[in-house]
């Protein structure tokens, strides 16, 4: 039904491919939280609403962030043509995080035998349970060093278990050169891993950026102490900054970027950096405007593959 692979462009930078063609993958960080049920959507229709609005906003991918959804969620992504990056929910603590590519300082977690066994059991079960959903194109075993351990071994095991999908070994670090993808987190403005250093062997992606905040009175979890990586008072101000980021992303695509993830789909409790409010009653910028500034990402003329 689909092939997820990599191949070089004419500059020798590895690109993420879909059915042997380069398709820039752009999606929101989606934590799947709800103000009443937390990890449980109030209705099936509410769950599907998020997917529909995501596509209407111009995204073609969702990074399902440190959560596993019901099988029906993945079915709806299959049906609606939305790609999925699936995170392993983070567990355990105690690592030192080094988010900067090429710098030392990050540490691998020395997990207890019980913790390591539980991780392997749960990650194995997640991959087994979700294997038959073609929308999933990327597995992400670790995020921002949280509980990260034996990175090379885990990435290689993940790839051996499921060679049909790409492996993003550590989204945002700690960075170990393994798997298929090198993933940088950078807030608020978009940056990318250096394609001259990492591109010959790995796809380079921006695993998180943005986080532009706009509290909407009457729809906040907390009326005070809300935050975004950069906050605004009006929707027009937010959109102007978002639009400028989209122009930057287009330039990065030409230089070697294969994918980007914007933080985030909805507000989550005191995080008011969603494109929708936590209760989903307010879409902060009209979906038509958001789509208009992302359509440019999908032009085939941006990238030429080596044939």
Q: What is the role of each PLM region?
A:
Residues 1-54, 288, 295-304:
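N-terminal carbohydrate-binding accessory modules
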Residues 49-53, 61-293, 302-306:
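Substrate-binding/catalytic cleft of secreted carbohydrate-active enzymes
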